[in-house]
Amino acid sequence: LKVLKEQTGGTPQRILEAACGGGRISVPLAQAGHDVTGFDVDEYMLMRCYARISGIPNIRCYCADAVTADWGRDYDVVLMAGNVLINIESETDYAEAQATFIKKAACALRPGGHLLMDFDLHGNPEAVFNRLKQSSYFQGTDEFGTTGKTIGYGSVFDPVTRICEATGHWELTTNNGETFIYPSGGGHKHIPTQRQIWGWLEDAGLSIERTYKGYTDEPVPDPVEGYCKTTVWAQKN
């Protein structure tokens, strides 16, 4: 919201959010006065989104596969947040799917429109993803009293393919105390380089106007040497 307000002067925008999930970002955007459309492939997350948007007239969401679906046209802003680039589920080659996301975002913009993209950049992914250690990155309880948490066992990173493979399981405890354990199979993620992402933006006809490091006003260094939470504001040529 801060970046959008800074770049648009607070003028209401027609916004598309790809992979909107439960509406964590889309709903506040609509409440701020923007006209918002969101889509996601996860029907269960969309159920949460449908519940949250009830009574808000300037937001709608629908179910679609971002890799294969048409994203629409003539949006002022397309938003790709929440590390969407490394959380794509598709049968397509991972790097190809990442490039496709950016191309589709560009196609959905009006001339002069902007892509707002938020993601993690890893200049040294081996240091982050080569680890064998149990950890949990999520735990929560839903409105029915079901508690869930993730348990990760570790991951390995291949510097040639830039694929990170991880394994772990989900633990679910229902409101009557019954516990279930589901193997998650782990993650299969392509960790793109800064050059790749910058190149995909250029190939899609997008010009980077501003970058933000770690949600501050400091620009993202080029090259990034370690880890950098990155926000990009890019205009359609």
Where are these regions (language model features)?
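Conserved alpha-helix/loop element of class I SAM-dependent methyltransferases that forms part
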Residues: 1-11
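Class I SAM-dependent methyltransferase "Motif I" SAM/SAH-binding loop
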Residues: 19-21
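SAM-dependent methyltransferase
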Residues: 116-198
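Class I SAM-dependent methyltransferase SAM/SAH-binding core
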Residues: 24-68
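A short glycine-rich, Lys/Arg-flanked "PGG" loop and its adjoining helix->strand segment in the class I
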Residues: 95-111
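A short SAM/SAH-binding and catalytic strip from SAM-dependent methyltransferases
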Residues: 76-96
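C-terminal lobe and adjacent flexible extensions of AdoMet/dcAdoMet transferase-like proteins
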Residues: 188-237
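A short acidic, Gly/Pro-enriched loop at the edge of an enzyme's catalytic core
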Residues: 68-77
